[in-house]
Amino acid sequence: MHAEALFRNLGAQMAGEGSVEGGKAMERKFLGEMGLNPDDFKVWDGCGLSPKNKVVPSVETQLLSKMARHPKGNYYINSFAGPGLGTGGKRQLDLPYPWLTRFKSGFIGEVHALVGYIFTMNG
């Protein structure tokens, strides 16, 4: 529900339309600016729960990579949880340095998923 409200607010603030369509318009614009094909992101709602949402996994990986190099990438990366933080509070990753991770967890229909970053000691 919060994600849906944020998506609509993004549309209102940036596209002048506080709706899912306004959010979609801004998302498409941003993806294009990032050099990605907006058609690879099929967004039906703002919360990500609709089975009509479709994202090409390799394009999601490209977006994560591009955001890591974006001038505001640190803000984006720091919005992800880590082990013991936020939604990552219950996650115990079997890594030598788990604090070098940032991730978003997901769970629906008995399926668990993680997406995010694992950093090396050199960045």
Go through each PLM region and give its residues:
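A small/polar active-site loop signature that marks catalytic segments
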Residues: 1-74
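Envelope-exposed proteins and targeting segments
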Residues: 2, 39, 111-114, 123
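Active-site-proximal beta-strand/loop segments in catalytic clefts of secreted hydrolases
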Residues: 6-10, 44-46, 79-80, 105-106, ...
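Short, mixed-charge aromatic SLiMs
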Residues: 18, 82-94
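Short glycine-/small-residue-rich flexible loop motifs, especially phosphate/cofactor-binding loops
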Residues: 28, 77, 99
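Hydrophobic alpha-helical segments
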Residues: 34, 67-70, 83, 118-122
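Active/binding-pocket-proximal capping segment
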Residues: 70-87
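Short, Gly/Ser/Thr-enriched beta-strand-loop segments that form substrate-interacting elements
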Residues: 90-121
